[in-house]
Every structure is written in C-alpha cells, then in structure tokens.
A protein has these predicted regions:
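Solvent-exposed serine/threonine-rich low-complexity stretches and specific carbohydrate-binding patches
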Residues: 31-33, 81-99
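Predominantly extracellular/luminal cell-surface or secreted proteins
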Residues: 77-81, 118-120, 134
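Edge beta-strands of jelly-roll/beta-sandwich modules across compartments, strongly enriched
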Residues: 68-72, 112, 121-135
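N-terminal prepro-regions of secreted/extracellular proteins
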Residues: 1-48
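Exposed aromatic-hydrophobic patches
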Residues: 42-45, 95-106
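Noncatalytic modules at the cell exterior or secretory-pathway interfaces
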Residues: 53-59, 105-121
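Short, surface-exposed beta-strand/strand-loop-strand elements in extracellular ectodomains
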Residues: 67-84
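Short amphipathic, basic-aromatic surface patches that mediate peripheral association
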Residues: 59-66
C-alpha cells in the first residue's frame, strides 16, 4: 500500500498550500587579487531560479583593476557544482555595473551554480568588487 503524505494530510483536514519558492538577494564579495589571468579564490555560488530562467548578476564597486578594462575585461566562469559548464552564458564586461545572465540549461530547482571571476590574461592588475545576484 502506497501512502501519500498529501492524502494523509487531507484526511486529517490539513490543506496544503504550496508557494512558489523565492530567493532573497545575495551580496557576495569576491576578489581576484593577482595580475593577469587570476581567478577569484572565492567562488560565487547561487541557486538557479525555479525554472532555470536567467538570474541577473550585478558587478559593482570595481577597484584596483587594470587601467584598460576595455582591452582586458573581466570574465566569469560559470560551472555547476559538479564542475560542468553552465549553458546559455551571456555577459557584459568592463568597469562599473555589468550584467551576466545565465541559464542552467537544466531547469531544475535547487541546482547550484558557481561563478569564479577571472581577470584577463593581459591584465596588469587584480580586481576587487561586489557581486549582487537578483533572481
């Protein structure tokens, strides 16, 4: 006999109310400290949205970066927690506020994605910045 929790609760007069999960904004400080080609030591982890829809990432408060960010842009390497590349990555680089939209490609609620911020191999400086995820 298969017992269903939903049916058992209904039998007790409990009505299930399922709300769509939401994610609070998360601010993560990440730092790529050394020159050319450095990858941030601190990964930026974020759950995907419920359907795998893109999440907005804002890069703000750039400091100590290369004097020529147009020629030596930052890059973002997005991976699943298992290390596989995430699909659908579209990003804008430079200084100021930039955006990165990424789609899990899986659409599974609860998947984690890890972004590591990297400086360009031609850069002569590292970068310090704040990353804000907005689902």
């Amino acid at each position: 006999m298969k017992l269903s929790l939903k049916k058992a609760l209904a039998a007790l007069g409990v009505v299930a109310c399922v709300a769509a999960p939401t994610f609070a904004d998360t601010v993560v400080y990440s730092n790529a400290v050394s020159a050319g080609g450095a990858v941030a030591k601190t990964p930026v982890a974020k759950k995907s949205s419920v359907t795998g829809a893109p999440a907005l990432v804002q890069f703000t408060a750039f400091a100590n970066y290369d004097a020529n960010p147009s020629a030596h842009p930052l890059t973002v390497r997005v991976r699943t927690q298992a290390g596989a590349p995430a699909t659908g990555v579209v990003s804008a680089y430079g200084i100021g506020t930039c955006t990165l939209y990424y789609n899990s490609g899986y659409g599974n609620y609860g998947d984690y994605y890890v972004a590591r911020i990297a400086t360009n191999t031609g850069s002569n400086g590292g970068a310090s910045f704040t990353v804000k995820f907005t689902p």
